[in-house]
């Protein structure tokens, strides 16, 4: 079992090797727009999980996930041999490719936040147009005794019975 620091160093090295091989050495059109995001290595250094994301050719184009997955699976052996040559470890880890869905989660959160901001703006508009119900001052002024016939002035602010 390797220590965690060694596993992290190996993962970083694998990430660099795979990313540069995809960008410069492997000439598969399905790998256009593939970006290596992260690599996780098991504690025994025998398996490496490579997380990738795919971008479209332009900002308006949708990414082609199926072509990228197929191209990565076709290049898996070549990439593993390049990792073995570049790392110098006794056992070259097997590579597993998993699409990173963080960008999808971020886009979904941005959409939810935009909807919440729009709802807040609607509530603010309703609040600006709202008027209080009833009269302008529905509460009685404590100094006013108008309309109180037969009530002793000393009993107006008392909380106990009117017959003191």
From Swiss-Prot:
It comes from the Bacteria. PANTHER family: RIBOSOME-BINDING FACTOR A, CHLOROPLASTIC-RELATED. It is found in: Cytoplasm. PROSITE patterns: RBFA. Transmembrane segments: none annotated. Its main location: cytoplasm. The keyword Cytoplasm applies. GO terms for molecular function: ribosomal small subunit binding. One of several proteins that assist in the late maturation steps of the functional core of the 30S ribosomal subunit. Associates with free 30S ribosomal subunits (but not with 30S subunits that are part of 70S ribosomes or polysomes). Required for efficient processing of 16S rRNA. May interact with the 5'-terminal helix region of 16S rRNA. GO terms for cellular component: cytosol. This is Ribosome-binding factor A. Monomer. Binds 30S ribosomal subunits, but not 50S ribosomal subunits or 70S ribosomes. GO terms for biological process: maturation of SSU-rRNA. The gene is rbfA. It comes from Mycobacterium leprae (strain TN). Belongs to the RbfA family. NCBIfam families: rbfA (TIGR00082). Keywords: Cytoplasm, Ribosome biogenesis.
């Amino acid at each position: 079992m390797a220590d965690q620091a060694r596993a992290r160093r190996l993962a970083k090295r694998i990430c660099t090797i795979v990313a540069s091989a995809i960008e410069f050495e492997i000439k598969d059109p399905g790998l256009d727009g593939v970006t290596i995001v992260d690599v996780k290595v098991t504690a025994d250094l025998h398996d490496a999980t490579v997380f990738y994301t795919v971008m479209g050719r332009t900002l308006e184009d949708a990414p082609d996930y199926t072509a990228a997955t197929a191209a990565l699976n076709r290049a898996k052996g070549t990439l593993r041999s390049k990792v073995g040559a570049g790392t110098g470890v006794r056992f070259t880890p097997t590579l597993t490719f998993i699409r990173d869905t963080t960008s999808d989660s971020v886009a979904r959160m941005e959409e939810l936040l935009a909807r919440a901001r729009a709802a807040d703006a609607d509530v603010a508009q309703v609040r600006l147009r709202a008027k209080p119900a009833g009269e302008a001052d529905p509460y009685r002024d404590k100094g006013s005794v108008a309309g109180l016939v037969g009530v002793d002035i000393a009993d107006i602010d008392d909380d106990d019975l009117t017959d003191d």
